[in-house]
Amino acid sequence: MGQTLFDKVWKKHVLHGKEGEPQLLYIDLHLIHEVTSPQAFEGLRIQNRKLRRPDLTFATLDHNVPTIDIFNIKDEIANKQITTLQQNAKDFGVHIFDMGSDEQGIVHMVGPETGLTQPGKTIVCGDSHTATHGAFGAIAFGIGTSEVEHVFATQTLWQTKPKNLKININGSLPAGVYAKDIILYLINQYGVDFGTGYALEFTGETIKNLSMEARMTICNMAIEAGAKYGLMQPDETTFNYVKGRPYATDFDSSMAWWKELYSDDDAYFDKVIELDVTNLEPQVTWGTNPEMGVSFSNPFPEIKNANDQRAYDYMGLHPGQKAEDIKLGYVFLGSCTNARLSDLIEASHIIKGQQVHPNITAIVVPGSRTVKKEAEALGLDKLFKDAGFEWREPGCSMCLGMNPDQVPEGVHCASTSNRNFEGRQGKGARTHLVSPAMAAAAAINGKFIDVRKVVV
């Protein structure tokens, strides 16, 4: 019996434990940020422990950082978390991509951009969207603060191996339909828990034809499908992305191992899902979890249970309405899901020569300083600002109500982020998840439109 991609990487990292029982995994890369690391560092101090592998631990500042005046942090808790990480990095010898540094940004942007994220690695971070790195053929997953401390102390974690679920995606994406629409559609069709207990391997011709940035968008939202892990087979697209990046110093010697990272033809999957994207439409969420979404041409569904009723009440919507009926007030282009250069380029095609609708506050937050510099080199900052968008500094920003960037209560926001929970973008904020192109078109038109009609 052959092995899946996930099985191969898992097996290589098992230090102790039997099949079917919790196993001790070696961790190749530990990414940290200011929110989930302070207590873990304090635990080391209390027990007088050293950091086991500071050379495999990298820090960035993202969740709490302001995106307007980055060195003027008014919130006391946010400021404390940021300064604490800066001091902890100094005390324990951790490399930090600090405020204002050339590489600072959202943790799931920084890893790939610097070449830290590589095929075949085990990667952890105290953040639920760590599966983003699985797009490179890595086992990457989010962990809690107690686990962060365990990795600090031992560079290992006890984990129970999940089952394997293959999502085979084929067909050519229509113009105006993107990777974000693929993952939103899957979650809408199969629910927010269909991946629970599984490692999701995304495969098929559609995946092979996607850029690395688009692949990361899909893996980023594996957790919204209930899965701890989401990954893809590394190929020439992957290798070309990694090659030449600062931390990819063992590129040539690693290729032999990387080229073995695929699921064997006779590998067993516990479950298989088939998807043809040929007729896929742009997706829009209407409710308060990512499962509550529709294809653009479809009306919002009938109320089936108390959760639906609560969602409609919170969102101020009702069954039978369509996405174009939503009265938008904010548009947010950003987050670890869709704040990469290709996302901003796609959005720029939509808004070029246009003006943001007078009823809309539109914000662009590049996911990292690297993306910001590259976008500005292309003149995208001027294009967005000329259209009426705010052009901000890198950070998690409006993805979560943990920093100054928040959506006002009761206001509907077209967002390229990954979660539309109650209060996610601020108290009473009403979030609608969409692709960057859909968000850009909404900013110009003041409402959702079928972006397939305007995509360039």
Swiss-Prot record:
Q: Which GO terms describe its biological process?
A: L-leucine biosynthetic process
- Binding residues for [4Fe-4S] cluster: 336, 396, 399
Pathway participation: Amino-acid biosynthesis; L-leucine biosynthesis; L-leucine from 3-methyl-2-oxobutanoate: step 2/4
Which coenzyme or cofactor does it need?
[4Fe-4S] cluster
* Keyword Flavoprotein listed: no
Entry-linked Gene3D superfamilies: Aconitase, domain 3
- List the HAMAP family: LeuC_type1 (MF_01026)
Function per UniProt: Catalyzes the isomerization between 2-isopropylmalate and 3-isopropylmalate, via the formation of 2-isopropylmaleate.
- NCBIfam families this protein is in? leuC, PRK05478.1, PRK12466.1
The UniProt subunit note reads as follows: Heterodimer of LeuC and LeuD.
Q: Which family does it belong to?
A: Belongs to the aconitase/IPM isomerase family. LeuC type 1 subfamily.
Q: What is this protein called?
A: 3-isopropylmalate dehydratase large subunit
What species is this protein from?
A: Staphylococcus epidermidis (strain ATCC 35984 / DSM 28319 / BCRC 17069 / CCUG 31568 / BM 3577 / RP62A)
